[in-house]
Amino acid sequence: MTQNLKSFKPADNSRLFSNDPGFQELLSFVCDEREADRLTSVLTAWEKKLPAWNDLSNEAARPEKLPRVEKYDRVGNRLEKVVFPPETKTIRREVVEAGIFSNQSEVEKFAKIYLLAQIGEGGVTCPLACTDGLIRVVQALGSDFLKKEYLPKLLSAEYPLSGAQFITEQSGGSDVGAIEGTARENKDGSWAITAEKWYCSAYDEFFCLAARPDGSPEGTRGVAIFFVPRLIDGKPNNLSIRRLKNKLGTQSLPTAEVDFEGSKGWLIGKKEDGFYNLMNYILNVSRIHNAANSLALHRRAFVEALNYAGQRVAFGSCLIDFPLIQQSLLSVLAALTARRGLFFSLLAGIDKQGLLPEEREQRLWQRFLINLMKYRTAFQLTGMVKEAILVFGANGIIEDFSILPRLLRDSLIVETWEGPHNVLCLQILRDVGRFDFFSRFKKEIGRIVQSWPAGTLDESRKIYLNAVKKAEELFTKERPADKVWVQTHARRIVDHLADLLEIGGLVRQGITQKNNRLLILAAHLTHESFRGPLAGFENPVIKNLPQFGLDLVSEKPVKGDLKGF
């Protein structure tokens, strides 16, 4: 404990995996024992690289180091490139060399990303997401030429994390069918793409562009996707950078406005399947990455707040001993634990079924979970980082005291990436109407209830079952076709369904692992989510914080009788 800040010790970023017991428990839950042991070994080695990357990330975020456009070389030849700080280039190269594309499972890949993204470097994690999506679509649908000429470069440390995806134009962003960029086929089978791309994050060497081939219909049915390199024969590929956007956050990540003026590219997949392929191979993968990044920023914010609260003394007591501080930490930890649990359960399912399983219901359920996780991990992220900042008081808003001010700015950007909240919720409800969602959801809830025996969190179980009943009453099979109802209540019902799945997952894990801490977090969320704005007055977790609050928010084992929970 410290009254004087001169003896304050920053949070330890050298053991982001080893000091995350909740994440270790989760991996043991979603993986078998042998795989969990293997992942522990892999991630223990991975975490040792993070302190150096964290230091490089902090240096790259300095205002004088931010990316800049270099349009010409010293004798006036066009370059049309973005110059990155050497620290960013070093992290990217070392991340590839360390094996970010060499994994035995999706759980392994995104466990690495969850730890990596805690350094708060959007200039690495965004291009990683874009490059991953571009690799997957070229592997699945690319021509032999693309696989031979460009796939090795996308995977290499020579061109580290150099992929990007440019969809948005002034005419449309989330409304992909409104884009106006065109593509004309050349005699050699390549295409000439002309487009004014308005939001080009991670501009580097290789791009996936959405454009409309000549003669294609309007709307999304006429959109195709193309592979476009920055350079052809060492010269700029008929493209021009207008400027880099002056964004609120992720300032170390260049986001450009780019004019493509007959740029040479190659069709990826069939042109009539362009929108389908864009959604399934590019946007879905980016949304998975976005969820992992959101969880990482959420975790880093919690770690920073917990570390500060455990040292800072005010009014004669350590901050962490104050009930209101414990409640702040509890709110951040509970939301993180629940959403992280559902996210890694999704990844474990992808490992079993594959991304885009052949069976239609499985594929649509997977897409439902991907969209749900992108939305749920991001929609309160800014609020969670702000809650962590407020634990610091005025020290929380000082740029060089902690990473939190940068995380706050970046969190708002992460919320907007790959579909704002309203768009995602409406997409979720459109997808619900395309398969027997209600039977599948009922099956998932049934598994939760069946594994939740009487005598365990009885009060919470009663509240949970009532919330299930309420969902069945509000969200009937007829609702997805009611456009007015959907447009009005999309976010409310999606949040309610998500609460049921996230809390239920916590209960199942807590029961399976005999983990009181997880069960208490589940009880807390049950009361807070389903009992209304005054739930805290009757919430048994809040009432019992004097008994176990310190252990709970410190992620230590919690002992005791949970009767009345």
Regions found by a protein language model. Give the residues of each.
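Extended, charge-enriched "interface" segments that sit outside catalytic cores
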Residues: 1-103, 558-565
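Glycine-rich phosphate/cofactor-binding loops in nucleotide/flavin-utilizing enzymes
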Residues: 3-25, 394-461, 529-565
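Internal helix-loop-helix
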Residues: 65-152, 156-159, 200-202, 340, ...
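A short core secondary-structure module
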Residues: 190, 194-238
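A glycine-rich, basic-preceded beta-loop-alpha segment at the flavin cofactor/substrate interface
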Residues: 234-236, 242, 257-286, 303-320, ...
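Flexible glycine/proline-rich, aromatic-decorated loop/lid segments
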Residues: 250-280, 394-418
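C-terminal helix-coil-helix/basic helical segment that borders enzyme active sites and/or dimer interfaces
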Residues: 337-376, 390-392, 476-488, 508-511
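C-terminal amphipathic alpha-helical interaction region
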Residues: 451-565
